[in-house]
């Protein structure tokens, strides 16, 4: 149970305690304890944040830090609170568009701000912004549709579910987003 829920093996002491317990409900008690642990949310949030391409920095050579920890913490809290998946989705894709959104619902839209961001000298701001939109489209497609959309960026393919035209319709939806970070030359 420990490996499945928290992604780490139980300690020797925990194994000994489990084996020494005579109650038939011991397994259920252990699972309930693990599910109520903050580490449960951390473990499953890590899986989600990998899909959302979360990072604490921009990468590239400049590798500037990002203030995206609030989004990471929101995902952990959502996992620990067992937020229903439909609400989890709505708040990340459009939390700021809900009627009277709470600060947490606005933070959830940090999903859109985890795209690649190159702020090195010489990078054209509009090219950077468009690359962020492409990344947002591709990540949203992979995360919620379970489909890689990158091929449709260049061409339609008879085996892919998304045509090039549909890809750019999706792109148009996200293409009203301002540049995340200005270039610092």
Question: Where do the protein language model's features map onto the residues?
Answer:
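Short, structured secondary-structure elements
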Residues: 1-2, 6-185
């Amino acid at each position: 149970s420990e490996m499945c829920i928290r992604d780490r093996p139980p300690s020797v002491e925990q194994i000994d305690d489990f084996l020494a317990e005579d109650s038939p409900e011991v397994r259920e008690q252990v699972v309930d304890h693990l599910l109520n642990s903050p580490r449960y949310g951390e473990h499953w949030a890590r899986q989600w944040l990998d899909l959302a391409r979360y990072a604490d920095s921009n990468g590239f050579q400049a590798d500037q830090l990002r203030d995206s920890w609030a989004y990471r913490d929101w995902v952990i809290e959502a996992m620990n609170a067992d937020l229903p998946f439909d609400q989890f989705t709505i708040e990340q894709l459009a939390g700021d568009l809900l009627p009277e959104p709470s600060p947490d619902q606005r933070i959830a839209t940090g999903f859109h701000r985890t795209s690649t961001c190159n702020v090195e000298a010489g990078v054209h701001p509009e090219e950077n912004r468009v690359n962020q939109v492409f990344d947002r489209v591709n990540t949203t497609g992979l995360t919620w549709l379970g489909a890689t959309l990158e091929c449709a960026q260049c061409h339609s393919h008879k085996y892919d579910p998304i045509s090039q035209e549909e890809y750019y319709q999706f792109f148009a939806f996200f293409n009203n987003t301002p540049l995340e970070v200005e270039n610092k030359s």
